[in-house]
Amino acid sequence: LHIGAGNDKVEIGGMDNPIIRNPLTHEPYIPGSSIKGKMRSLMEWKFDKLKSTGGKVCFCGLPECKVCRVFGSANTKSEEAKDRGPTRLIVRDAVLTKEWKEKFRNGNSIVEEKNENSLNRITAEANPRPIERIVPGVEFDFEISYRVIDTGDNGETDKKYFKEVVLESLKLLQDDYL
């Protein structure tokens, strides 16, 4: 797992792609926005939204758009937005489980440096670079909240979309990566 934090400056031999860490505890975490964004992206693929958006994020804002209704839309000014209502899904940051926090605090290494290399396909020039990543098997806890809103249908559409969109996107995420 690698969720990059970027780096203001890179020193020779230094890490140019560190993971995101809590600034107080230095524990790695996964931003809820990264999880939600990946879930949204997977559902846009599943519902074939990328053709109509030219490969961009779907922000049509239409009330019948499952993606915009569940994940939200920047289109908040239209009449359709009033019918759709606010985003239904809230994904909180994923933090280390209690067990893994203890291991981290006891000095167990849960972060590793991996050296990667990209090649220029024309010149074959190598571009080696180190990245930080979480070792396999580390577990995180996270919380998802889903709002069911009555927009004239007693909340039935939101209940249906919980199964069709939220649960399905979590299943797809398990078979994918962040």
Give the label of every model feature segment.
Residues 1-119, 123-178:
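RNA-binding basic/glycine-rich loop and surface signature characteristic of RAMP-family CRISPR effectors
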